[in-house]
Amino acid sequence: LYDYLQNGTELPEKPIVITFDDGYIDNYEDVLPILQSYNMQATIFMISDAINTDRFVSANQLQVMNAHGFTVESHTNHHRMLTFVDPSTWVDEIKGGKDTLEGFMGKPIKYLAYPGGFNNAEIQRITSESGFKMAFTVTPGTVKPSDNLYALPRLAIFQGDTPYLSFWLRLHCAPFIAYTWQLRDTLRDNGFTTLANLMLLF
């Protein structure tokens, strides 16, 4: 994806990038075997501080995943929603998380997913200066060559609440989905909570 956006490298037909955030143990126990059975790859955005803790993958499991179809990248150090915490913590969350994960993996960590997608221009600057090549949000949409490398959209699929029709709509109607989500957030931010909750968001 980076080579496509930065250098114009041709993509395969019907390209898709599959990502998983946080690093829960089911990524190792359930997702990895499924990916292997279909000869597919994915990226796991790992919370550095969660490695070797309850409900999350271990360092050894990350190494196995990295060797069998998963690219391991960063989801910050402690999974703090960056725009809601003291800016003095941003470097530790972004660069500190990268450094810690590189220590576990023994390889460069190039990409970041912001927790909750929350970011701003200063966070993007720190991300770039920390050595990341791209960073991802949860703003719904498909990636285009004109996109900001440090605020790339994704299509969120959540466990248990995404039936096939919703999944299909998110894939094929991303601009409309993005508009409805943004409208929902605007209504909620301006006190129209009930109306926001009534919106069909797919």
Where are these regions (language model features)?
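Active-site beta->alpha N-cap acidic-glycine motif
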Residues: L1-H68
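C-terminal active-site subregion of NodB/CE4 polysaccharide deacetylases
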Residues: L1-T19, I25-Y28, R80, F84-F202
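Histidine-centered catalytic micro-motifs
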Residues: F20, T71-H79
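Glycine-enriched alpha-helix->loop->beta-strand junction motifs that scaffold or abut catalytic
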Residues: Y38-Q41, H68-V72, S128-A135
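Short beta-strand and adjacent tight-turn residues that come in two discontinuous sequence segments
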Residues: F45, H75, A135-T137
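Short, flexible active-site-adjacent loop segments at beta-strand->alpha-helix junctions, enriched
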Residues: S48-A50, T76-H78, A156
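Generic alpha-helical hydrophobic packing signal
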Residues: Q63-H68, H75, W90-V91, I126-E129
